[in-house]
Every structure is written in C-alpha cells, then in structure tokens.
C-alpha cells in the first residue's frame, strides 16, 4: 500500500500521512470469526492501573486469527484481504475446500484468488505453512512457532520476516529481525514469505487526536512532574535527573537496563544475541 499525503490546510494535517488501503478488497469482516473485545483501559480485574497510556479509542471486535495453520492437506482459496484494527498487518480470509473459513496474517504478494495450503507436503510458495524441517535454507519466513502446535509467535507484525540459516539435528537456525540467531525445533511451523503492509512504519500520525482514536493516551515526561509523582520530578526550572541513571516511575533503573532474567532455559538456544542499535 502507498502513503497518502495531505495538503497543510490545518496544523494537524501538515505532516500527516495515511495508507491508501489499495490492497483492501473487503471492508466488512466475516461474522463467524468475530469475538467481543471489551475495553480494559490499562486496568486489571481489581480495577488497578497496570499499563499506563491506555484508554479510550474506537470500538473494536477481535478477529480470530489462525496462527497454528494446522489444517493440513486441504487447499484454501484467498477470498479477500481485510483491515484488522488489532494489529499492524492486514489479514486474509481463507475459504477451504470443505467450506471452513479462517483468517491468516496476509503476507506480502498474496492476492485474492490464489490458493494456499499447510502441511509437510505443501509447496514452497508465499502463504503456505510448513514444518521448519521442510523449508529450504535461505527461505524468508514469518509467523514462526516456538513450541510445536502452540501457534506462531515470532515475526507477525507488518513488514516482519526471518530467515532460515541452517539445520542442526533436531533444530533449525533462524535469524530474527533483531539480528538474533536462534535455534528452534524443526517440528515447529512457519509460513513462507514476509508479512505485508510494509509502509505501516512510515505513517505519520500528524496529531494527538489520531493517537486517541487508537486508544493511546498522552505520555507525560517524569521531569515535568512533582517529586512525589516521579523520581525525575521536582527542582527549579529544567533540573537534571540527579541520579546515576534514568528511573522508571517506580524507582527502577531504565533506558538501557537489561530486563531479561539472568538464567533462562532458552538461553542455550540463542546462538548469537541481537544486534546493538
């Protein structure tokens, strides 16, 4: 999809860009694949705030996505490409030969009318899902499982992809988008191709109200708060932080502080850490 630019008739529109949604072929979702999605506004079951900057936003319904791709040996036809308000990628509605309908993440290049399938015998073409042991080295993949049968967890957002680097015994080496090289069980599944909607990262929101439509509330800097509200707060004028490192609102070191647990069982599966940016 291409980006649309707007004439600067107001300050909010001056730098605003949107996607033209040229790839979207149907605007009404499949009713049988919808579920209610109540708003939480960042609160837990006790009503306490657990996630900041959440609240408001347009009403949404959840689209049930098939991340497992476990309907083997049955050809599915791409019925439509649709917008999903719950993720950055578009979704594709598949209609299987037996009449069942499922949503999948729409990879780059998938067109209405094309056929896809899943299983060890599937061809190596965009949209097909196979076990990693059946995917050739060098293939670009997305929607990668970490545990067999659990469903894809890696490389699911717009433009995301990973690459098969090699095979060692019961493991397959995968290079993730972050640069990390990781071993994943060869019986885990992945889908061929790169996730579509590559232009998503180039969209300029343009105004605060557009973030509010998405359910994103303002992010206030700690340095402009009072000292009882944030460790960075207080002082006369533009005061420095006054601590060895930046702190979270709860006094924990942040901005560069490692948050991964020291000894994690999956550490032995990471061949090379992610690149430093």
From Swiss-Prot:
Keyword Ribosomal protein tagged = yes
Give me the ranges of the annotated region Disordered. Answer: 211-277
Pfam families xrefs: Ribosomal_L2, Ribosomal_L2_C
Keyword annotations: Ribonucleoprotein, Ribosomal protein, RNA-binding, rRNA-binding
Q: Which InterPro entries match?
A: NA-bd_OB-fold, Rib_uL2_dom2, Ribosomal_uL2, Ribosomal_uL2_bac/org-type, Ribosomal_uL2_C, Ribosomal_uL2_CS, Ribosomal_uL2_dom3, Ribosomal_uL2_RNA-bd_dom
Per the record, the GO terms for biological process are:
cytoplasmic translation
What GO terms fall under cellular component here? Answer: large ribosomal subunit
Molecular function via GO: rRNA binding; structural constituent of ribosome; transferase activity
Oligomeric form and interacting partners: Part of the 50S ribosomal subunit. Forms a bridge to the 30S subunit in the 70S ribosome.
**So what does this one do?**
One of the primary rRNA binding proteins. Required for association of the 30S and 50S subunits to form the 70S ribosome, for tRNA binding and peptide bond formation. It has been suggested to have peptidyltransferase activity; this is somewhat controversial. Makes several contacts with the 16S rRNA in the 70S ribosome.
Per the record, the similarity remark reads: Belongs to the universal ribosomal protein uL2 family.
Spell out the HAMAP family in the cross-references. Ribosomal_uL2_B
Instruction: State the name under which the record lists this protein.
Output: Large ribosomal subunit protein uL2
